[in-house]
Amino acid sequence: MKHNDKQEKLAKAFKALLKEERFGSQAEIVTALQEMGFENINQSKVSRMLSRFGAVRTRNAKMEMVYCLPVELGVPTTSSPLKNLVLDVDHNGALVVIHTSPGAAQLIARLLDSLGKAEGILGTIAGDDTIFITPTSDTDIEELYLSALELFEQTP
């Protein structure tokens, strides 16, 4: 089997495993891939693959921290369980701050950035579990705060 074919099969198997949203550690992924016949796989290869495919750690339906792939097509919507990843929304008169489950901030920020200036969002900065939302110059911060609360079905 050619090297490229092996790499393709490994990538396909890797993505399939992450879509199951049940692997909480790189060691678990290594074991699963080895059981699938990829005997030369190790933790460092899995780590590189996680980075290459943009995998993130987030909570699954059972509230376990697991590796998963970001949504590959389109921008996430609030009808998906993303709203469940938002823990708190607040503001200080200048910025709106959103606290999320660990690993979820960049995904939520992507959604907010897609709303853009029409919704009063100049831009976002996201870490692992915190997002800063900068309003446009003509946006009232209180209105942006209330919009964010409504978007993620939070109460003030």
UniProtKB/Swiss-Prot annotation:
Annotated GO MF terms: arginine binding; DNA binding; DNA-binding transcription factor activity
Predominant subcellular localization, coarse grouping: cytoplasm
Domain of life of the source: Bacteria
InterPro entries tied to this protein: Arg_repress, Arg_repress_C, Arg_repress_C_sf, Arg_repress_DNA-bd, WH-like_DNA-bd_sf, WH_DNA-bd_sf
One GO CC annotation: cytoplasm
GO BP terms: L-arginine biosynthetic process; protein complex oligomerization; regulation of arginine biosynthetic process
Keywords, in A-Z order: Amino-acid biosynthesis, Arginine biosynthesis, Cytoplasm, DNA-binding, Repressor, Transcription, Transcription regulation
Protein's cellular compartments: Cytoplasm
Pathway listed: Amino-acid biosynthesis; L-arginine biosynthesis [regulation]
Pfam entry (one): Arg_repressor
Homology family: Belongs to the ArgR family.
General function of this protein: Regulates arginine biosynthesis genes.
Protein name, per record: Arginine repressor
